[in-house]
């Protein structure tokens, strides 16, 4: 086949308009404008775009601007706008923190007016009472221990009461048999052996 025949075959495909809705055709035309429409749009473009002519030449590859502005189109903010937005965000954050602090102070003030802080006072009083009770219990324990010690002493005194302690060896014995007891001890110890408990000379003899 000749190249001419190929071209004829490519361009001889008819697109019957009866199958397409005219509204759809308009939408397609708006989405993909013709080069003539691109040229018209570039003529009526803003002065900022006129300052850069290379955008006109490369406008065919990019999405062209239609005559009717798209309300959903996103325009990126400038640096100043971004700075303003950041400052406003920082201000709102600081205001929120201040408002929270003021609200907490107001709530505390309202609680104090209503008498809720008395709970803290009551807790302090309870703690003081618990400390006093602990001190009292410790004092009672000490008193009890002292009382038991006194009872032990008194019981010891009671036990020692009927039993008379033997007088020291240095002092003379009250009984008249002291001399006899001393002689008996001397006789019990043999003359060759030393007495286990040597008796010092009594002052009575």
Curated annotation (Swiss-Prot):
GO biological-process terms attached to the record: behavioral response to cocaine; cellular response to cocaine; DNA-templated transcription; intracellular signal transduction; locomotory behavior; memory; negative regulation of female receptivity; response to amphetamine
Region listing for Disordered, in residue ranges: 1-205
Record's compositionally biased regions (Basic and acidic residues): 41-63, 167-177
Post-translational modification note: Phosphorylation of Thr-34 is required for activity. Dopamine- and cyclic AMP-regulated neuronal phosphoprotein.
Keywords: Acetylation, Cytoplasm, Phosphoprotein, Protein phosphatase inhibitor
GO molecular-function terms, A-Z: D1 dopamine receptor binding; D2 dopamine receptor binding; D3 dopamine receptor binding; D4 dopamine receptor binding; D5 dopamine receptor binding; protein phosphatase inhibitor activity
GO CC terms: cytoplasm; cytosol; dendritic spine head; dendritic spine neck; glutamatergic synapse; neuronal cell body; nucleus; postsynapse
Highest taxon listed in the record's lineage: Eukaryota
InterPro entries: PPP1R1A/B/C
Subcellular localization: Cytoplasm
Positions of post-translational Phosphothreonine modification: 34, 75
Start-end of Polar residues biased regions: 89-100
Statement: the UniProt record of this protein carries the keyword Transmembrane helix: no
Modified residues (N-acetylmethionine): 1
Bias kind Acidic residues: ranges: 118-138
Modified residues annotated as Phosphoserine in this record: 45-46, 102, 137
Similarity remark: Belongs to the protein phosphatase inhibitor 1 family.
Function: Inhibitor of protein-phosphatase 1.
UniProt cross-references to PANTHER family, sorted A to Z: PROTEIN PHOSPHATASE 1 REGULATORY SUBUNIT 1B, PROTEIN PHOSPHATASE INHIBITOR AND DOPAMINE- AND CAMP-REGULATED NEURONAL PHOSPHOPROTEIN
Protein name: Protein phosphatase 1 regulatory subunit 1B
Gene that produces this protein: Ppp1r1b
């Amino acid at each position: 086949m000749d190249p001419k025949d190929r071209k004829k075959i490519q361009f001889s495909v008819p697109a019957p308009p009866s199958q397409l809705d005219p509204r759809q055709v308009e939408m397609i035309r708006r989405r993909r404008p013709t080069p003539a429409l691109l040229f018209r749009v570039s003529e009526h473009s803003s002065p900022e775009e006129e300052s850069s002519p290379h955008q006109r030449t490369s406008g065919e590859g990019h999405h062209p601007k239609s005559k009717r502005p798209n309300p959903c189109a996103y325009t990126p903010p400038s640096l100043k706008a971004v700075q303003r937005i950041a400052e406003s965000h920082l201000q709102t954050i600081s205001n929120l923190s201040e408002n929270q602090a003021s609200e907490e102070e107001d709530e505390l003030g309202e609680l104090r007016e209503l008498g809720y802080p008395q709970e803290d006072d009551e807790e302090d009083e309870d703690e003081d009472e618990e400390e006093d009770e602990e001190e009292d219990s410790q004092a009672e324990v000490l008193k009890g221990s002292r009382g038991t010690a006194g009872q032990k002493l008194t019981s010891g005194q009671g036990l020692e009461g009927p039993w008379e302690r033997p007088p020291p060896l240095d002092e003379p014995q009250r009984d008249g048999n002291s001399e006899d007891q001393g002689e008996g001890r001397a006789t019990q110890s043999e003359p060759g052996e030393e007495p286990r408990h040597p008796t010092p000379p009594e002052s009575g003899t």
